[in-house]
UniProtKB/Swiss-Prot annotation:
Transmembrane segments: none
Protein name: Methenyltetrahydrofolate synthase domain-containing protein
Organism placement in taxonomy: Eukaryota, Metazoa, Chordata, Craniata, Vertebrata
Alphabetized UniProt keyword annotations: RNA-binding
Residue ranges constituting the RRM domain according to the UniProt record: 306-379
Coiled coil: none
Gene Ontology cellular component terms for the protein in this record: cytoplasm
Cysteine disulfide links: none
Length: 383
């Protein structure tokens, strides 16, 4: 007898599904399936059903979650020569990675590319400013109803990834969402458990069925900021970049537990320095020498309206390390003056507002193990 979702909470339903799959030996590696998107016996068979969907035939770019039961779909996407996008693990360094098999990849190589190891070894990151248009989204689930209500493992990453894709214009309300589950994971889910930030699904694929849910409930229209905690902001750098963008556009980006407007989201990011070193970047001519002047009084030595000082650079840092960090945090200047031997750089922004925002966003920025000093800059005579 298959489980019935009679619990009063999402967690009740999760526990029922996990327990049933283990007790009935329906689960597959990795086990136990508790606190996971459960892999199941027959997952590859269920994945094959996606070939029968017209929406799959029409797609070119497919975003597939990295969960084990979706491995068969990732392989089919690659075999069909479609673009395969996967979420960056735990969204630590971005939103998407593109799986790029080597030229002339054999079937065995494509199979490796579809695994979690392949995601690590054959992927390249896609930047926040990349023009990505996702045609189809494939997510894992712990439980799903024939009406299209979905329950994940409880961390909220699939819902957040979708909301972030909406925010960056990668998906629209017309983009179909597919989930792949065992038949026992298709259960009744009370609609009152479904929240506005929850992603719903349009198709459910099991080893024995293809279910078109006909779900009419609107999908999330973007990031629900008041559901985002400060802890999550610290864990996910790209959230800070998206928040800064939406705040600049005049949107309400108040976080969970906040009761007043914050000047700018603080940004802290550790950027690893490259292992293989090139010779140090040659410093350009220093026509103007600047020093940090946080809180200096107006008058002589007052901050320049649009210049930001970055100090305490690691001795072996390269300009490319800093540029990468600025891109990831959405604080790219008009021009960058690099003074590596003096362990500092200057960022030149179009106006004082952009410079102030950059100073706020870059507080706590790290390159390697060194925390950088970031402040508005003042012009001084070179000594």
């Amino acid at each position: 007898m298959e489980p019935r979702a009679v619990g009063v909470s999402k967690q009740d339903i999760r526990e029922q599904i996990w327990g049933y799959m283990e007790s009935q030996n329906l689960a597959d590696f990795p086990r136990p399936v508790h606190h996971r998107i459960p892999n199941f016996k027959g997952s590859y068979l269920a994945c094959q059903n996606i070939k029968d969907l017209d929406v799959f035939a029409r797609t070119q770019e497919v975003k597939v979650d990295p969960d084990k039961p979706l491995e068969g779909v990732r392989l089919l996407v690659l075999q069909s020569k479609k673009t395969l996008l996967v979420p960056t693990p735990r969204l630590r360094t971005g939103l998407f990675n593109k799986i790029t098999p080597p030229p002339g990849a054999t079937k065995d190589i494509l199979r490796k590319c579809a695994t979690s190891q392949g995601v690590r070894n054959y992927s390249v990151p896609i930047g926040l400013d990349s023009r990505v248009l996702v045609d189809l989204v494939v997510v894992g689930s712990v439980a799903v109803s024939e009406k299209g209500w979905r329950i994940g493992k409880g961390e909220g990453y699939a819902d957040l990834e979708y909301a972030m894709m909406v925010s960056m214009g990668a998906v629209s309300k017309e983009t179909p969402v597919v989930t792949i589950v065992h038949d026992c994971q298709v259960v009744d889910i009370p609609e009152e458990l479904v929240e506005e930030h929850d992603i719903t699904v349009d198709y459910i694929l099991t080893p024995t069925r293809v279910i078109a849910t006909g779900c009419k409930r609107p999908k999330p229209m973007g990031i629900t900021w008041f559901k985002i905690s400060l802890e999550m902001m610290e864990k996910i750098p790209i959230l800070r970049s998206l928040r800064a963008r939406e705040q600049q556009a005049g949107k309400d980006v108040t976080l969970q537990g906040e009761h007043q407007h914050l000047p700018e989201p603080g940004c802290q990011q550790t950027v690893p320095l490259s292992v293989g070193r090139r010779p140090p970047d040659t410093p350009g001519p220093e026509t103007n020498s600047m020093e940090a002047a946080p809180g200096s009084p107006p008058g002589e030595g007052a901050p320049l309206a649009a210049d930001v000082y970055v100090g305490n650079l690691p001795g072996d840092a390269r300009v490319s390390d800093l540029k990468r960090a600025l891109r990831e945090l959405g604080s790219v200047p008009l021009r960058l003056t690099w003074q590596g031997p003096r362990r500092r750089a200057f960022l030149h922004y179009p106006d004082s507002a952009a410079a102030q925002q950059a100073v706020s966003c870059l507080q706590g920025l790290r390159l390697g193990t060194d925390t950088l000093r970031v402040a508005l800059a003042r012009q001084q005579r070179d000594k």
